[in-house]
Amino acid sequence: MADITDIKTILYTEKSLNLQEQGVVVIQTSPKMTKTGLKAVLKEYFGVTPKSINSLRMDGKIKRFRGRLGQRNNYKKFYVKLPEGVSLENTEA
């Protein structure tokens, strides 16, 4: 079962800020999170039922550290369309 601890952060990038005007919030989570799990977490902790959820899996970048190759963590990104007049910033978790 998905938990609130699986949500890493709400992303604030140029693209996500433009999407917020259309009622879409971009959420970064652990790779094991699913759409139904995220929907349950949003309903339980934020009291919000999303209109739609789109997801994509992001592979961690390959980086060099002290001459050796390493990899950043993989994560999932969700685009959550919220109902009119609802935002996650106004709710208390």
Swiss-Prot record:
The keyword Glycosyltransferase does not apply. It holds the Pfam family Ribosomal_L23. One of its GO terms (biological process) is translation. InterPro entries: Nucleotide-bd_a/b_plait_sf, Ribosomal_uL23-like, Ribosomal_uL23/eL15/eS24_sf. Keywords: Ribonucleoprotein, Ribosomal protein, RNA-binding, rRNA-binding. One of its GO terms (molecular function) is structural constituent of ribosome. GO terms for cellular component: ribonucleoprotein complex; ribosome. It comes from the Bacteria. The keyword Ribonucleoprotein applies. Part of the 50S ribosomal subunit. Contacts protein L29, and trigger factor when it is bound to the ribosome. One of the early assembly proteins it binds 23S rRNA. One of the proteins that surrounds the polypeptide exit tunnel on the outside of the ribosome. Forms the main docking site for trigger factor binding to the ribosome. Belongs to the universal ribosomal protein uL23 family. This is Large ribosomal subunit protein uL23. It comes from Campylobacter jejuni subsp. jejuni serotype O:2 (strain ATCC 700819 / NCTC 11168). The lineage of its organism: Bacteria, Pseudomonadati, Campylobacterota, Epsilonproteobacteria, Campylobacterales.
